[in-house]
């Protein structure tokens, strides 16, 4: 009821297009909540498949580890499960001007401005993307398996990710729970990069605790590859930023822009889409841009997670310029 009343108030304060957006947000969140049933109910149900049963039991153990060993919130999140019967829970639409590497901000009354707009319907997401393209923006659509309500509600396990390999399931749960620890308004890169550092440290500790050394080595290798990709994206983004700020003609900028994306696709064609553009770079940067800074902060905290979280909460409440200086944010 709190969700409905809050969002209904928001719709009364917004224009027609915003009313439509919040209406789908209300409906989408309510559908997720209605579909959720306690884990014990699913585990006791004879119709639950052995594969799903095993994953739910694994998720419960991971959830317990998160609170017991990682000092992540101990609450009702991930104590229930919802079968959504679709591949993603939401579709995020990222947009950036044709000659800019900065995101078009999407601003909301309670969460502040973020670097994307999320839709519970792929059709609505694609329609919004087409409108943005018509206005001259670069656009990238990303299907999302999970999201956090920032502790406002008890987030359920979802069919969109429950069958992930166990390491990836743990990674996702640690990431989403981290969003309940600290949240900075108007700073998507801060929030997502922090959650990435928590998820990675969490998975390392989780694997070590079980003596799964082979999987730990594989995870470390995968993270190293991700760092290399993130570095290449950051370099491409930096070069494009300089190109866009230059006095070159739009024709010259467009040519150099195309060359940069050809180069990036040649290096990482397996993960860079054919239609990669400025918005795609934004979608990567928000999850990677500040990771090195948070890793340093964790090291400075001696690996003590509660101390690390306390420092991050202080930063989240501070002026953005102070955060940028400490985390050495790159363009």
Identify the meaning behind each predicted range.
Residues 44-48, 57, 61-71, 178-182, ...:
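Sec-exported extracytoplasmic/periplasmic mature domains
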Residues 22-50:
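Post-signal peptide N-terminal segment of mature Sec-exported envelope proteins
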Residues 32, 45, 52-59, 118-125, ...:
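Solvent-exposed, acidic/flexible segments
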Residues 13-15:
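C-terminal motif of bacterial Sec signal peptides marking the signal peptidase cleavage site
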Residues 2-7:
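Sec-dependent signal peptide recognition
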Residues 17-20:
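Bacterial signal peptide processing site
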Residues 230-331:
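Pan-zinc metallopeptidase signature
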Residues 61-226:
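Acidic/His-rich structured neighborhood in mature extracellular/periplasmic domains
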């Amino acid at each position: 009821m709190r969700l409905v009343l809050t969002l209904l108030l928001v719709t009364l304060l917004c224009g027609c297009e915003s009313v439509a957006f919040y209406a789908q947000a209300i409906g989408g969140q309510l559908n997720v909540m209605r579909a959720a049933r306690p884990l014990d109910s699913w585990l006791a149900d004879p119709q639950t498949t052995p594969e799903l049963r095993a994953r739910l039991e694994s998720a419960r153990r991971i959830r317990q580890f998160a609170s017991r060993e990682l000092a992540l919130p101990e609450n009702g999140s991930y104590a229930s499960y919802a079968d959504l019967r679709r591949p993603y829970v939401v579709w995020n639409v990222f947009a950036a001007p044709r000659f800019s590497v900065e995101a078009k901000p999407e601003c909301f009354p309670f969460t502040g401005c973020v670097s994307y707009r999320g839709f519970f319907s792929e059709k609505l997401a694609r329609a919004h993307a087409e409108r943005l393209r018509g206005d001259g923006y670069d656009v990238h659509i990303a299907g999302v398996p999970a999201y956090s309500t920032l502790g406002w509600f008890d987030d359920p396990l979802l069919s969109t990710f429950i069958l992930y390999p166990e390491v990836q399931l743990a990674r996702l749960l640690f990431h989403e729970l981290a969003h309940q620890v600290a949240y900075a308004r108007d700073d998507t890169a801060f929030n997502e990069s922090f959650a990435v550092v928590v998820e990675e440290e969490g998975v390392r500790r989780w694997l070590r605790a079980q003596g799964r050394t082979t999987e730990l080595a594989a995870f470390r290798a995968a993270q190293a590859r991700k760092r290399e990709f993130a570095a290449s994206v950051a370099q491409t983004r930096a070069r494009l930023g300089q190109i866009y700020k230059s006095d070159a003609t739009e024709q010259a900028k467009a040519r150099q822009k195309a060359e940069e994306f050809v180069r990036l696709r040649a290096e990482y064609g397996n993960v860079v889409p054919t239609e990669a553009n400025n918005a795609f770079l934004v979608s990567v940067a928000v999850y990677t841009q500040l990771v090195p800074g948070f890793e340093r902060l964790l090291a400075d905290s001696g690996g003590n997670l509660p101390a690390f979280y306390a420092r991050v909460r202080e930063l989240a409440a501070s002026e953005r310029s102070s955060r940028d200086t400490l985390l050495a944010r790159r363009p």
